Amino acid sequence: DVDGSGKLSIDEFTQIIRCFNTTVTDSEIAALVRQADLNGDGEIDFEEFIATQTYESGLKISIAGLRSFKKILLQYQKVAKFSSIALIEVDSELGAGTRGQSMGTAALREAAIQKQAARVHAENGVLSLDSLQVQTENWADALGHKHQYAKYIDKLYQVLSRTTDVVAQTLQEGLFPVVLGGDHSTAAGTIAGIKKAFPNHRLGVVWIDAHADIHSPYTTPSGNMHGMPLAMATATDNLAKQINDLDSDTLELWKLCQRLGLADGANFSIEDLVYVAVRDTEEAEDHLIETHQILNMTTEHVRTLGADVVAQRCLEKLEGVDLIYVTFDVDSMDSTICMGTGTPAPNGIFVKEACLLNETLLKDPRVCCWEICEINPLLDTLNTMVENSLGIFETVVDAIANRLEVTPKV
């Protein structure tokens, strides 16, 4: 009852129904509204609301569902009322093994402008073309790296710290951050920024990617830090699978990366991590996935259950968290349609599946930040990767705009 009238408007009633079941259709909601509004005044009073529990409908409410609903209501009070979307560009590529990811953010943004898919803040309050740009250190590539098992960690730490501050400030200003990332290493900064803005909230992460990205300098076979963001964010070293010995300088910088925005501890718990489409992993990562029983909704799950059901399973796994961060690495898609990325992998999801997956996730009011990364125009053919990514980006912006109750211009 947002306006304190003592009754639920049709919109308030609809929001409640969607909290219980994010996959319910508009027609199903309309039918339930017709049943509930007994006197036809366009509002649902207390007696009418209680009576809805006796109706035959597709909506089943359990005690567990009510507990989850209580947590969702708290999130509506705390973080769901964003005033608009803020676009943040972090075009860093030092964490990757190839070059070109730094061009991905600009390519996606340019494609959006050309297709008039970007929203203009001045006209409708949804998405500003004047994006926030995090200063990067890509110039350091020309000088080479000093840290064998955490390449460019000295420069990346600076980028991660800046990303932390920008994301935190954006959230504190009541804006929904949509992050356009270069390589995936900077996701550690995004996560730290969320935690900095909401230090007392329990954070969950949905990691949509072909790779687990949970190596540490102790376990990495390559030293590329785009494979380490989750180990940074969860303060995980995985010493049981150690193959590398670190020098004191690398170790000191690594500990700083693990404490981004914190005095101590981790930015989120590894138990509050969910994978989607992860399929190209290594032994050290498999050990962590098995040890911590990290849920991985595979491409096969997406095909057999449907992307919307998979999204719902992810949300159910994270029912105990207060906030959710969703990050989408384009290599989660099948290599036949995403060669424009540094580490493509076969047996991935397709564009329509990615759209539905992200759209369903974003209906949950606990989702407070979304990120897309690893687009590499230098490896692309006929701009396929950028165009596919643009379709997903448009879907996401529309989904967020619907939550903000605004109608964006396209």
Locations of regions flagged by a protein language model:
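Conserved tryptophan-centered aromatic signature that marks the ligand-binding surface of SH3
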Residues: 4-7, 31, 40
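EF-hand and EF-hand-like Ca2+-sensor regions
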Residues: 19-23, 34-76
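Short aromatic/basic micro-patch
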Residues: 7, 43, 267
